Protein backbone atom coordinates (compact mmCIF):
# COMPACT_ATOMS: atom_id res chain seq x y z
CA UNK A 1 0.00 0.00 0.00
CA UNK A 2 2.84 2.42 0.84
CA UNK A 3 4.37 1.75 -2.57
CA UNK A 4 1.08 2.71 -4.24
CA UNK A 5 0.83 5.97 -2.28
CA UNK A 6 4.43 6.93 -3.06
CA UNK A 7 4.07 5.98 -6.73
CA UNK A 8 0.89 8.02 -6.97
CA UNK A 9 2.69 11.04 -5.50
CA UNK A 10 5.53 10.68 -8.02
CA UNK A 11 3.03 10.46 -10.85
CA UNK A 12 1.23 13.58 -9.60
CA UNK A 13 4.28 15.80 -9.12
CA UNK A 14 6.16 14.32 -12.09
CA UNK A 15 3.37 15.07 -14.55
CA UNK A 16 2.84 18.47 -12.95
CA UNK A 17 6.34 19.48 -14.09
CA UNK A 18 5.40 19.18 -17.74
CA UNK A 19 1.98 20.74 -17.24
CA UNK A 20 3.47 23.82 -15.57
CA UNK A 21 6.17 24.19 -18.23
CA UNK A 22 3.46 24.03 -20.90
CA UNK A 23 1.43 26.67 -19.04
CA UNK A 24 4.55 28.85 -18.67
CA UNK A 25 5.12 28.79 -22.41
CA UNK A 26 1.64 30.17 -22.87
CA UNK A 27 1.95 32.64 -20.00
CA UNK A 28 0.32 36.02 -20.34
CA UNK A 29 3.33 37.87 -18.95
CA UNK A 30 6.95 37.41 -17.93
CA UNK A 31 5.81 37.24 -14.32
CA UNK A 32 3.35 34.48 -15.22
CA UNK A 33 6.12 32.61 -17.06
CA UNK A 34 8.44 32.86 -14.04
CA UNK A 35 5.73 31.80 -11.61
CA UNK A 36 4.84 28.67 -13.60
CA UNK A 37 8.51 27.75 -14.10
CA UNK A 38 9.07 28.13 -10.35
CA UNK A 39 6.15 25.79 -9.70
CA UNK A 40 7.64 23.28 -12.16
CA UNK A 41 10.97 23.51 -10.31
CA UNK A 42 9.27 22.89 -6.97
CA UNK A 43 7.45 19.88 -8.41
CA UNK A 44 10.76 18.50 -9.71
CA UNK A 45 12.23 18.87 -6.23
CA UNK A 46 9.24 17.08 -4.75
CA UNK A 47 9.67 14.31 -7.32
CA UNK A 48 13.26 13.90 -6.13
CA UNK A 49 12.02 13.51 -2.56
CA UNK A 50 9.52 10.79 -3.48
CA UNK A 51 12.10 8.95 -5.59
CA UNK A 52 14.52 8.97 -2.66
CA UNK A 53 11.79 7.65 -0.39
CA UNK A 54 10.93 4.83 -2.81
CA UNK A 55 14.60 3.92 -3.05
CA UNK A 56 15.23 4.04 0.71
CA UNK A 57 12.16 1.84 1.23
CA UNK A 58 13.56 -0.70 -1.27
CA UNK A 59 10.62 -0.35 -3.63
CA UNK A 60 12.95 0.43 -6.54
CA UNK A 61 16.40 -0.97 -7.23
CA UNK A 62 19.62 1.00 -7.06
CA UNK A 63 19.90 0.81 -10.84
CA UNK A 64 16.37 2.12 -11.36
CA UNK A 65 16.91 4.86 -8.82
CA UNK A 66 20.20 6.04 -10.34
CA UNK A 67 18.72 6.17 -13.82
CA UNK A 68 15.58 8.05 -12.85
CA UNK A 69 17.22 10.40 -10.35
CA UNK A 70 19.86 11.38 -12.93
CA UNK A 71 17.10 12.45 -15.31
CA UNK A 72 15.28 14.31 -12.56
CA UNK A 73 18.45 16.14 -11.49
CA UNK A 74 18.99 17.21 -15.09
CA UNK A 75 15.43 18.56 -15.20
CA UNK A 76 16.07 20.48 -11.97
CA UNK A 77 19.26 21.99 -13.44
CA UNK A 78 17.46 23.05 -16.62
CA UNK A 79 14.53 24.57 -14.73
CA UNK A 80 16.87 26.34 -12.29
CA UNK A 81 18.73 27.89 -15.22
CA UNK A 82 15.48 29.00 -16.87
CA UNK A 83 14.21 30.55 -13.63
CA UNK A 84 17.51 32.38 -13.00
CA UNK A 85 17.65 33.68 -16.56
CA UNK A 86 14.03 34.80 -16.46
CA UNK A 87 14.75 36.70 -13.22
CA UNK A 88 17.67 38.47 -14.92
CA UNK A 89 15.56 39.45 -17.92
CA UNK A 90 12.97 41.41 -15.97
PLM regions: where:
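Short, C-terminally biased terminal segments at protein or domain edges
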Residues: 1-19, 23, 27-90
